[in-house]
Each structure stands twice: as C-alpha cells, then as structure tokens.
Design a protein with these regions (language model features):
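Bacterial Sec-dependent N-terminal signal peptides
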Residues: 1-33
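Extended soluble regions of mature proteins
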Residues: 23-289
Length: 289
C-alpha cells in the first residue's frame, strides 16, 4: 500500500479517536482555497472590535484557547469570526506574493490556539456570522473533503429573550450586569457592559442593552470571555456568495452535527485494510435544536 495513503489513514483515525476528550472539534481543517480566503471583498469598515477567548484554559495565554474570536462593528454590518483564521490567512497571502506560489497553500501557516487542535475543524471556528439590522447570516465552512457542503443561511436577530439579574462583576475594567436566557435547548448566562454601546457579542449572542463581554452555558461547555476592546480602522471582509450556496439553519446545523460526531463515515471514508471506522464521538452542540 502507498505509504502516503497509510499516513493519511492513521492520521484521520487518530484525529477522530482523540476527539472524544474535546467534543467541540473534529474532522480536518478545510483547504483555504475552498473557503475562498483570497477572494474576500470589503463590505464595511469597523472602528471598534472586541476580541474573545473561546474555552481558554488560561485567559492570559492565547495558546490555551480553542479560538480567539472577534466582533467587528461597522456602520452597516457587525461580523463575528475567528481572528486566528484571519491572521493565518494574512500570512498565507504574504507568502504567496513573496514566493509567487500558485498552488494550494500549506496548512503550516496556522497561528494561535492550542497546538494540538491546529489540524482540527470546528463548526464555531470555521463559520463567519454577519449581522445587518435585524438579520443574521452565517457562512458555514465544512471540514476537509466535505467543503462541497459549504453553505449560508439567514435568520432573524436577535432571537434571545433575556432576564436581567442584580449581580455584577468587572470585566476589562467595565462594570457588567448579569442576564440569563434559554436558547435552543441550552441555558445561558451573559455579562454585559451598558457603558460599551454595542448591542452584540460573540457568535449569535445579542439583544442586551450593551456589549456582552462574557457568556457561557450553565454547564460551561462553551465559554466566551472578552480579552480586549480595540479601536482603530478594520476592514470587514466577506467570502464570495458563490462559494456558499443558500441553505437553511436546520440543514446546516444537521450537517455540522453529522461531521462532528462521525467525520469518517460522513465523508465516506473506507479503510483499505478493512478496519472499521472509529465509533461516533460524544458531541454537545451549542444549539441543541
């Protein structure tokens, strides 16, 4: 058997069997070209952005994050996406210009986050969320060998109905108030700063009278915490629509769940040695329904 094929098979098996300990990541990192990393267009300019650590083991160390997310606030659009992915793509573009390379870019340009997860795909990391008025649009990128599933959909925003509480805490020097809600099968706790006039937060969170600086489900499977509020001039970029055909939230959600729980079977992988694929992993989706 070709040694390269054996290596790929073993690597894929290791990824899926090791994903049990970290149910929020699975599959393999998709190719940049299929994401359209070098075809993005500028749709707005942000003057402020908020950076969030996702599931940090040490909030002071980016190398312990699953992701460093960012909320960019423009005049017409708000966007939540991965800063780690954007930084990695910027380095890849620089390298292509410097070397004149015209083929696929090596995956070694990944910047930030837990080193053991650099080869893994996560539906949260590899999705961009755009908010225009009262509408949210997700551009969902799927893992390696499933990029044909890349899709987009829209839904109303915000959909969360919050209950305010009296508790307060300080985050990044801002006095934050507690709020709670139940959303698509999970109970969430958010801490928002009324003195930061941004009605939004990480992922799809919003609907509070101030910027959400910390939010988590009550089981703390998913935890976002703001690590910086930055002011400057930031271009808000968008992938080309042609690479992300229109779909529905339910369809995207079902497919993201499928590729996370059972990646090898989902991509139609078959062992050349006749070995069975690893069992499904236990996955706790952010949206349960």
């Amino acid at each position: 058997m070709n040694k390269r094929i054996i290596t790929i098979i073993l690597a894929l098996s290791a990824v899926c069997s090791g994903a049990v300990a970290q149910p929020k990541v699975s599959g393999r990192v998709p190719t940049r070209e299929k994401r359209g990393y070098d075809q993005q267009i500028v749709i707005d300019t942000a003057s402020v952005r908020v950076l969030y650590a996702l599931n940090a083991k040490d909030i002071k160390d980016e190398n312990t994050y699953i992701d460093l997310g960012k909320l960019e606030v423009g005049k017409r659009v708000k966007k939540y996406s991965s800063e780690f992915i954007d930084l990695s793509d910027e380095e890849a573009v620089k390298w292509k210009k410097k070397t004149g390379h015209t083929g696929y870019v090596p995956k070694s340009f990944w910047i930030g986050g837990r080193p053991e997860l650099h080869e893994n795909w996560s539906e949260l990391v590899f999705s961009d969320y755009f908010i225009r008025g009262n509408q949210l649009k997700e551009y969902a990128c799927f893992p390696l060998w499933a990029e044909r599933e890349n899709s987009s959909y829209t839904e109303p925003w915000p959909l969360m109905q919050w209950t305010l509480a009296d508790e307060q805490q300080t985050i990044l020097g801002h006095r934050c108030q507690k709020a709670t809600c139940r959303f698509r099968g999970r109970d969430f706790v958010a801490w928002f700063a009324a003195d930061v006039p941004i009605k939004g937060g990480p992922w799809k969170f919003g609907g509070l009278p101030g910027c959400i600086l910390k939010v988590y489900d009550v089981q703390k499977i998913y935890v976002w915490e703001a690590v910086a509020i930055e002011r400057g001039t930031y271009q808000i970029m968008q992938y080309p629509d042609k690479l992300y055909p229109k779909s529905t939230r339910k369809s995207v959600w079902q497919r993201q769940k499928k590729y996370t729980e059972d990646y090898l079977n989902a991509i139609g992988w078959t062992s050349l040695e006749g070995r069975p694929t690893p069992p499904k992993i236990h996955f706790e989706p952010l949206e349960k329904e």
